[in-house]
Amino acid sequence: MKKFLIAPSILSADFARLGEDTANVLAAGGDVVHFDVMDNHYVPNLTIGPMVCEALRNYGITAPIDVHLMVKPVDRIVPDFAKAGASYISFHPEASEHVDRTIQLIKEHGCKAGLVFNPATPLSYLDYVMDKIDVILLMSVNPGFGGQSFIHGTLDKLRQVRKLIDDSGRDIRLEVDGGVKVDNIAEIAAAGADMFVAGSAIFGQPDYRK
């Protein structure tokens, strides 16, 4: 079994001191910095872009940066995030006109590529790209806003994807995002996830280590 990775979502951080807050959460045990990138088009919210990614790199953040694109179109912004220092770039297949080409674009720019599945998105998008992706991210809430409750049906979907990954024999991370808390993370891990995005559950605590 792979090492579990915790990916604090900076959407819940204090943006007035983002560099310091990000460094503190990594020092407390975070493994990966998670970016929720929203365009007020694919999802009804507007958040951050490549400039913030570059600023964190310039601040001295060396941990992997995991960019979750909730934007449409996807391809236009991929090179910008790669240049800004992204490590992983994941996108929603519904937001790309050509899923395979977008995966290739991400890889050509030196990043690991991921596909993101909303709660009601079928897994059939994986049928022809399992040999090309590095991350599968399952949304356990509907995308657009932080602080939502975990959708319990995601556990069955996690089990399905875990089997697909194991059967493929490939080194693919299984990430989950939405409503991950101290009281449900063990159950989520048991269903097959090995990378956990958490925002308010981490940044909302006085001591990030907890």
Curated annotation (Swiss-Prot):
It catalyses: D-ribulose 5-phosphate = D-xylulose 5-phosphate. Its EC number is 5.1.3.1. GO terms for molecular function: D-ribulose-phosphate 3-epimerase activity; metal ion binding. Substrate binds at S9, H68, G144, F145, G146, G147, D177, G178, G179, G199, S200. InterPro entries: Aldolase_TIM, Ribul_P_3_epim, Ribul_P_3_epim-like, RibuloseP-bd_barrel. A divalent metal cation binds at H34, D36, H68, D177. The active site is at D36 (proton acceptor), D177 (proton donor). Binds 1 divalent metal cation per subunit. Keywords: Carbohydrate metabolism, Isomerase, Metal-binding. SUPFAM superfamilies: Ribulose-phoshate binding barrel. GO terms for biological process: pentose catabolic process; pentose-phosphate shunt. Pathway: Carbohydrate degradation. Pfam families: Ribul_P_3_epim (PF00834). Its cofactor is a divalent metal cation. Belongs to the ribulose-phosphate 3-epimerase family. HAMAP family: RPE. Catalyzes the reversible epimerization of D-ribulose 5-phosphate to D-xylulose 5-phosphate. This is Ribulose-phosphate 3-epimerase. It comes from Serratia marcescens. The gene is rpe.
